[in-house]
Amino acid sequence: MSSKLVLVLNCGSSSLKFAIIDPANGEEYLSGLAECFNLPEARIKWKMDGAKHEAALGAGAAHSEALNFIVNTILAEKPELSDQIAAIGHRIVHGGEKFTASVTINDEVIQGIKDAVPFAPLHNPAHLIGIEEAKKGFPHLADKNVAVFDTAFHQTMPEEAYLYALPYNLYKEHGIRRYGAHGTSHFFVSREAAKTLNKPVEELNVIVCHLGNGGSISAIVNGQCVDTSMGLTPLEGLVMGTRSGDIDPAIIFHLHDSLGMSVEQINKLLTKESGLLGLTEVTSDCRYIEDNYATKADAKRAMDVYCHRLAKYVGAYSALMEGRLDAIIFTGGIGENSALVREQVMKKLALLGFEYDHDRNLAARFGKSGAITTDNSRPALVIPTNEELVIAQDAARLTA
């Protein structure tokens, strides 16, 4: 065991993912999830030394109680593990324009995260609680907390990619522009792709599809992001689990004026009731859609819309590749595991020189990486993401 482990925290609005990782080799010594915050069934699950555990946190418990449990119950039973923690890495969804890379957390960084709350109203406040509680739980590491921003990797986008065609003053005065998300995943996967393709990162031109309950796609030219599908918030872009992705903005006025829906109701509809859930009217679970694609109209409808949108984005981003596309990469829970999504998308991309291989596609699932195209094809690769490792490595590097 290394003497410099990193505690990685990912505080969501109603959950907290945590892990203790050796940044040198990626080995996980502890991983877990606390969920159902502020509800009677608030609970925590964790895995340590190969064994799985679960406990109730108490009715109404939230981030504070979860971190208290991690420090005073889980780690109290394993002091030798706790003693090895040398830094704490925090996933931060939105850093606005201020943060182009990971940073050690100080008062100025805290203020920057607060300033970006309007762009991530559910996540950024939770991150701030996580930082505060981590400093309380590990007072000796108060100056060893590091923020890793989902938006940072996309800060290389040129103006023509991040500006909306709105009055320019809205950008200058209020920061209304496209920021993107999942940047840590896009960064990690593109670097892994460079190794797989045996190319220097600074010469790498790829399109990365991060497909999970949230989904985004990025165009990476010479190792840097030049465009991405998520916008001011993670609502723009692809069809997602419960998010609509791109829609005609006038639909919002129609829902308000003609159907009498309030702004709050429309927000809930677009973020929590749309996407795959809206299209199936049953579930946002891609596994249901894949299992029932051939037999149920709702599953076929959802899958077809999802893949149509994704293939369209890949086609659009191929125009940004400056004449050379090295590969397309699939990652995230759906990207890594849904052979059907990849098959449907690849079949639409034959014009770009992709030749789909059925057997390879079925083999590259459940944590396995690999090509899903023939030997003569332009490569399409499955590469499992590891955002926690990036966070751990950045935290270790910045606090060394």
From Swiss-Prot:
Substrate binds at R91. Its cofactor is Mg(2+); Mn(2+). It catalyses: acetate + ATP = acetyl phosphate + ADP. The active site is at D150 (proton donor/acceptor). It is an enzyme of class 2 (transferase). It is found in: Cytoplasm. Catalyzes the formation of acetyl phosphate from acetate and ATP. Can also catalyze the reverse reaction. This is Acetate kinase. It comes from the Bacteria. Its main location: cytoplasm. The gene is ackA. Mg(2+) binds at N10, E387. One of its GO terms (biological process) is acetyl-CoA biosynthetic process. The record marks H182, R243 as: Transition state stabilizer.
